[in-house]
């Protein structure tokens, strides 16, 4: 997907020799293929996107990939920007997991949140800025080495209270309920899901559209709701709808009804 490509590009710009292991559109790479590449190439690190928003795919085989990585003395680094905490992931199984404030954590954009295994922290050259080691050193003094996004941190604190008061399991369940409703309704009016059912994300739906996607986006915006067009290889033939965070099921029912009318009027 788009963000897996960006992750590879990011590694390459930092001097890494990147080998891509590709899977089918709407799915994830085969575990046996991953195992063969790891055992043959002996990489220093494995990078993966947990929740690929361009295709609506959640990689639910990452625990097995982590086991393969650690068995072969490789680090495993995960991009979960649009996944945590609505798409479950056990961060303790990985060396680095990065997310952000503005997706399923329901806060405004502006803060990066990173889990890391401190045992591996010193194994890579340190960059001139955003040095994790400096953050760790400052934590003991309840300080940060650089000016933090204070308003975002306050907003994040509020959103975390909401999630924790609700309970993480219930929060995940609500997202699954919203996503199941959305797919069931839209498939019934002619849309086709992009992700394979087992890998269907809890936070973003990606669907092939029965009519021109831009018509749908424009007409839906007139009702007061905004959705996104496709990305990557399916940019011109799909739509994406985010359900993460504070998106109510009642909103999705309105969107589904509006989409039904748009499809009927534009066949």
For the regions a protein language model found, what residue spans apply to each?
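PLP-dependent aminotransferase-like
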Residues: 1-44
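PLP-dependent enzyme catalytic core of the Aspartate aminotransferase-like
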Residues: 237-267
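Active-site phosphate-binding strand-loop segment of PLP-dependent enzymes
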Residues: 29-81, 85
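Conserved PLP cofactor-binding pocket of PLP-dependent enzymes
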Residues: 223-240
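Conserved PLP-binding catalytic core of the aspartate aminotransferase-like
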Residues: 192-220
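Conserved active-site segment immediately N-terminal to the catalytic lysine
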Residues: 91-102
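Active-site C-terminal subdomain of aminotransferase-like
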Residues: 102-188
């Amino acid at each position: 997907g788009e963000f897996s490509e960006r992750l590879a590009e990011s590694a390459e710009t930092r001097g890494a020799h990147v080998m891509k292991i590709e899977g089918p559109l709407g799915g994830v790479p085969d575990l046996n293929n991953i195992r063969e590449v790891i055992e043959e190439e002996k990489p220093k690190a494995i990078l993966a996107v947990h929740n690929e928003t361009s295709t609506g795919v959640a990689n639910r085989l990452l625990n097995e990939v982590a086991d393969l990585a650690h068995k072969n003395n490789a680090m495993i680094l995960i991009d979960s920007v649009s996944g945590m905490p609505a798409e479950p992931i056990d961060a303790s199984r990985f060396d680095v997991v990065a997310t952000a404030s503005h997706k399923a954590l329901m806060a405004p954009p502006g803060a990066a949140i990173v889990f890391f295994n401190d045992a591996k922290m010193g194994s890579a050259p340190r960059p001139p800025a955003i040095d994790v080691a400096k953050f760790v050193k400052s934590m003991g003094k309840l300080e940060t080495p650089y000016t933090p996004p204070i308003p975002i941190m306050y907003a994040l604190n509020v959103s975390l209270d909401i999630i924790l008061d609700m309970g993480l399991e219930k929060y995940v369940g609500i997202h699954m309920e919203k996503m199941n409703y959305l797919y069931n309704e839209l498939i019934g009016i002619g849309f086709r899901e992009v992700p394979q059912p087992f890998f269907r994300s809890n936070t973003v739906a990606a669907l092939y559209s029965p009519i021109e996607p831009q018509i749908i986006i424009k007409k839906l915006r007139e009702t007061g709701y905004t959705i996104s067009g496709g990305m990557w290889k399916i940019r011109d033939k799909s739509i994406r709808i985010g359900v993460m965070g504070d998106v109510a099921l009642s909103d999705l029912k309105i969107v589904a009804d509006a989409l039904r009318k748009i499809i009927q009027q534009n066949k």
